[in-house]
Amino acid sequence: MEDLAERRLQTVRDHMALEIVSDWDAVIATFEHPRYEMATGAVFDGEEAVRGYFAASRTPFPDQGNEIIAIAHDGDTVLVEFWLTGTHLGPLKLRGQTIEPTGRSFRVRMAASFEFPPGSDKIICERPFFDPGAVSRALGL
């Protein structure tokens, strides 16, 4: 495999590992321009918006993690299938309500695409794909 493809795969592996340890400065550094496009249609564009997304998603699940199942590179895209894990330890905003911590854990299967500009190993967009109700069901909510 070419060097650029290997560097892109490593960038994604590093990005995901840094998310587990909540090293947000280092996660941001994996981007050329931080941007998340969610399956729900929500877009977090720019460092401030992405940091806000990190804070909001980690408040209910401060131990949120991921376990890579498969990773592949094609063109300017890296695709990852992974387990998303976490424990409901903080308030969760769900359907206009705030759900107090249950202490329950979840493990749901997800996928994400990571887009790169031509010739670069810096991410320009992460697009996570998941069933929005999967975590709620796993938590019994």
Predicted regions and their residues:
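C-terminal and inter-domain tail/linker signature
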Residues: 1-141
